[in-house]
Structure formats: C-alpha cells, structure tokens
Amino acid sequence: MKIFIQNQQDKVDIDQHISKIIEESIVNTIKVFLEEENFEISVLIVDNSFIKELNRNYRNVNKETDVLSFPIFEFKNGKLLEDIVIMEDEIPLGDIVISIEKAAQQAKEFGHSLEREIAYLTVHSVLHLLGFDHIEEDDRKVMREYEEQILQSMGLTR
C-alpha cells in the first residue's frame, strides 16, 4: 500500500508522529474491508482557508470543514461497485484533504488529543472513500460504529 502525505500549511507543526497516525489509520481502516494491499491514497494537510476554498469549489459550501474525501472508484459500504482494470501496481482509492488547523480546534473543543482527532478524521475520510456515508441516520450509525471500532483497535478512545 502506498500512502502519500503532503503538508501544505504552516499553522500547525506536523511531525513524524502525526504522519504515522495518519498511515496507521488508513491501514487499519482498509484492512477491515479489503484483502488486497495494493492500494494508493494521497493525503493533503492544509489550513482552514485552503479547505474552505475546496469546499466551496467542490461542494458549493462556503465554509471551512475538517476533512474532504475525493474517491476515485464507486464503493458502497466497503464493496467495490464497478469492475476496474488498472495497469499500475497500486489501485488509487482517492485523495483525502485534512485541515490540521480545524483538527486542532476540534481536538481542543472535544477535549482530546490532536492525534486522536487526526486519526478520527482519517478513518472517517477513508470510510467515505470506501462508500460509507452519514446522510441517513441508519448509515450514520453504521459509519460511527466502524469509526469507533477502528479507533479502539488503535488504542484511541474518547
């Protein structure tokens, strides 16, 4: 599995520990649903102004958010809905954009560590790449159960 993490902000210091949390969150989420490990995910770490612009451009929502997911293939609840033929070694699942600035604000607001918030946002976003959503209440419950299960497996609880 290839995971690319790029930091494009300077408001919050990002160290190797944060990168490791992101990688572990991705791996632990993927392995719940997919047997193969030949996937690729890109993670972009940004500030609030950058993610606000993306949110406005891609979702027509003119406000900052904590995380955005950009899937490449169509999944539904962890199952691929289309046949794909990839000519490369890794199958690109999609891109994740995390506002580290928003994550730091939320960690403080919720009274837990930045590491826990980053892990949560990463797991949440990977679940979106895998076709989970939280628009309907039943879907939200399923997604929240997976989020908590994966975070607990990493030793990250509220």
From Swiss-Prot:
Q: Does the keyword Metal-binding apply?
A: yes
Which keywords describe this protein according to UniProt? Cytoplasm, Endonuclease, Hydrolase, Metal-binding, Nuclease, Ribosome biogenesis, rRNA processing, Zinc
Subcellular localization(s) per the UniProt record: Cytoplasm
- Cofactor(s) needed for function: Zn(2+)
Signal peptide from the UniProt entry: none
Cofactor info, note text: Binds 1 zinc ion.
Q: Which Pfam families match?
A: YbeY
**What cellular-component terms does GO give this entry?**
cytoplasm
Return the PROSITE patterns for the record. Answer: UPF0054
Q: Which GO terms describe its molecular function?
A: metalloendopeptidase activity; RNA endonuclease activity; zinc ion binding
Where is Zn(2+) annotated to bind? H124, H128, H134
GO terms, biological process: rRNA processing
Q: What is its EC number?
A: 3.1.-.-
Listed InterPro entries: MetalPrtase_cat_dom_sf_prd (IPR023091), YbeY (IPR002036), YbeY_CS (IPR020549)
Q: Does the keyword Repeat apply?
A: no
Purpose? Single strand-specific metallo-endoribonuclease involved in late-stage 70S ribosome quality control and in maturation of the 3' terminus of the 16S rRNA.
Regarding protein family, the annotation reads:
Belongs to the endoribonuclease YbeY family.
Protein name in UniProt: Endoribonuclease YbeY
